[in-house]
């Protein structure tokens, strides 16, 4: 098979959801269909020690949340599928955002009893900003939930995207009978030995069943007043196909996967800082680092740089240019992933995610190219942290471990580091409290460095240009610091202090990140 054909086989997507909507369970079912796991375990297995395959970090196993982003790959129906599992917890939107820069589509999992929740909305905004297709899976039909028409209406009103139901539930909870599959023009049966039936047999199968009659009425209403199906609108991120089902009972998941792969896009091009777009079918290899993860294998204390291949083909041992430094690097120790297991990879193509063994060479956002190509991809977004803590080593004798741990976790993008301009004290910035807890846990367990953390509360952060810096600008209402790139930054105690500063120094430009 040619490289061109290999690239066209790739389907790379992320699963986004609010915590507990069933993201881990549906991921397991997809891996099951891809033949990667023998049985699709559920999160309930945590009591027995059979942890969900996509949750590998110790703290994830304890809490049942996805803190990091796993990458899982499998072959199915002639396609090579790459799933990026994103952290669903509200405190990890920064890492999630970067992960969403590396995919070509998103699958949004919604709890049908709860509808669109806060984190789903935040993550959807990120996806909408990129303009990539979104496919919706309304989960947990095996339990009583909200009316399907209400769910569609809320999805459209809250998220501002048109929807098109690919199938429709016949009852739910204990009365759940199956799905009326509009797209495939068939019935999918929840009970009995037969999985599918013809639509014309529905009146016989569900004679005198009020839920079937209700489903037919709803579908008639949607046919008359609903949105039209449009593949073009789906690919433009303007219309989301909606699938109903139950990941826990593995009902409707394979139908979703089959249909999703028909419409999910091939690998996208990616823009450079100069505004050019690099075509995936370009023969020259290029890619960017969207994540760095330390200690994926605690026995080896290693670091992996996750690279999204944008164009061409990776071959083991190839030499690449690192645009940021202007230096070359050899890609010899490279892996691909199946949750916590990984394998050395000989070659991979545009759309694939590879893990490059990193000794400190790479940073999040780095561009890799070959030959005389020296372009740079658009920078990945940075979140402005809201919460801050002072941090220091508890044991002076452990300074080396302390500094190594901080350096690696900061490069990984797990937390942001600021240094007080006057005192040299370290300050950590995060978008949520849980990031601090994970940082402390990992420093102690992975680097054997206990830390003392002192809350500083919420701060309003603004960057300034180095040429505008004057240390006399620092006052009791702000802290002058520098970020890990040595850029000057002010931490204001509140919005009032920010406005006071802006009035006093009108010529100083204050910059905010996302």
Curated annotation (Swiss-Prot):
GO biological process: regulation of translational termination
Coiled coil: none
Domain tr-type G, residue spans: 8-268
Pfam families in alphabetical order: EF-G_D2 (PF22042), GTP_EFTU (PF00009), RF3_C (PF16658)
GO MF annotation, one: GTPase activity
Classification via CDD domains: RF3 (cd04169), RF3_III (cd16259)
Example of a GO cellular component annotation carried by this entry: cytosol
SUPFAM superfamilies linked to this entry: EF-G C-terminal domain-like (SSF54980), P-loop containing nucleoside triphosphate hydrolases (SSF52540), Translation proteins (SSF50447)
Keywords: Cytoplasm, GTP-binding, Nucleotide-binding, Protein biosynthesis
Annotated localization: Cytoplasm
Transmembrane intervals: none
Classification via InterPro entries: EF-G-like_DII, EFG_III/V, G_TR_CS, P-loop_NTPase, PrfC, RF3_C, RF3_dom_3_sf, RF3_GTP-bd
Record-listed GTP binding positions: 17-24, 85-89, 139-142
Database matches in HAMAP family: Rel_fac_3 (MF_00072)
Function recorded in the entry: Increases the formation of ribosomal termination complexes and stimulates activities of RF-1 and RF-2. It binds guanine nucleotides and has strong preference for UGA stop codons. It may interact directly with the ribosome. The stimulation of RF-1 and RF-2 is significantly reduced by GTP and GDP, but not by GMP.
UniProt record similarity statement: Belongs to the TRAFAC class translation factor GTPase superfamily. Classic translation factor GTPase family. PrfC subfamily.
Name of this protein: Peptide chain release factor 3
Organism: Streptococcus thermophilus (strain ATCC BAA-491 / LMD-9)
């Amino acid at each position: 098979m040619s490289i061109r054909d290999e690239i066209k086989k790739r389907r790379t997507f992320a699963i986004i959801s609010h915590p507990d909507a069933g993201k881990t369970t549906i991921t397991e079912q997809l891996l099951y269909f891809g033949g990667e796991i023998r049985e699709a375990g559920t999160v309930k297995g945590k009591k027995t020690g059979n942890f969900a395959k996509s949750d590998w970090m110790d703290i994830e196993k304890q809490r049942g949340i996805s803190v990091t982003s796993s990458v899982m790959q499998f072959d199915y129906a002639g396609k090579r599928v790459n799933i990026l599992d994103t952290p669903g917890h509200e405190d990890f939107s920064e890492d999630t955002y970067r992960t969403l820069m590396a995919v070509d589509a998103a699958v949004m999992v919604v709890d049908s009893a709860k509808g669109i929740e806060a984190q789903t909305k935040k993550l959807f905004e990120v996806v909408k900003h990129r303009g990539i297709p979104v496919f919706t899976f309304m989960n947990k039909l095996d339990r009583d939930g909200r009316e399907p028409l209400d769910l569609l209406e809320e999805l459209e009103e809250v998220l501002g995207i048109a929807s098109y139901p690919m199938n429709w539930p016949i009852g739910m909870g204990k009365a759940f009978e199956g799905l009326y599959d509009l797209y495939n023009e068939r019935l999918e049966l929840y009970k009995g030995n037969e999985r599918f039936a013809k639509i014309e047999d529905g009146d016989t199968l569900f004679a005198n069943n009020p839920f079937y009659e209700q489903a037919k009425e709803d579908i008639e209403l949607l046919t008359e007043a609903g949105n039209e199906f449009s593949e073009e609108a789906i690919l433009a991120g303007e219309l989301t196909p909606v699938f109903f089902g139950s990941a826990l009972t593995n009902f409707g998941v394979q139908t979703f996967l089959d249909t999703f792969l028909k419409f999910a896009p091939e690998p996208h091009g990616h823009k450079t800082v100069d505004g050019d777009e690099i075509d995936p079918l370009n023969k020259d290899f290029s890619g960017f680092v969207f994540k760095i993860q330390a200690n994926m294998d605690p026995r080896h204390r290693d670091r992996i740089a996750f690279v999204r291949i944008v164009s061409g083909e990776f071959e083991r041992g190839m030499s690449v240019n690192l645009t940021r430094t202007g230096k070359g690097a050899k890609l010899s120790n490279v892996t691909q992933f199946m949750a916590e297991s990984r394998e050395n990879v000989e070659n991979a193509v545009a759309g694939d995610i590879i893990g490059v063994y990193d000794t400190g060479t790479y940073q999040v956002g780095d561009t890799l190219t070959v030959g005389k190509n020296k372009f740079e991809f658009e920078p990945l977004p940075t979140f402005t942290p809201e919460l801050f803590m002072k941090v220091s080593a508890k044991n002076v004798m452990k300074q080396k471990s302390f500094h190594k741990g901080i350096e690696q976790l900061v490069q990984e993008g797990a937390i942001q580091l600021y240094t007080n301009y006057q005192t040299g004290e370290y300050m950590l910035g995060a978008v949520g409290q849980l990031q601090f807890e994970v940082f402390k846990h990992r420093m102690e367990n992975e680097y054997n460095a206990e830390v003392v953390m002192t809350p500083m509360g919420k701060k309003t952060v603004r960057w300034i240009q180095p040429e505008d810096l004057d240390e006399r600008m620092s006052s009791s209402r702000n802290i002058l610091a520098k970020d890990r790139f040595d850029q000057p930054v002010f931490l204001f105690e509140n919005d009032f202090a920010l406005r006071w500063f802006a009035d006093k120094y009108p010529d100083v430009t204050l910059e905010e990140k996302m």
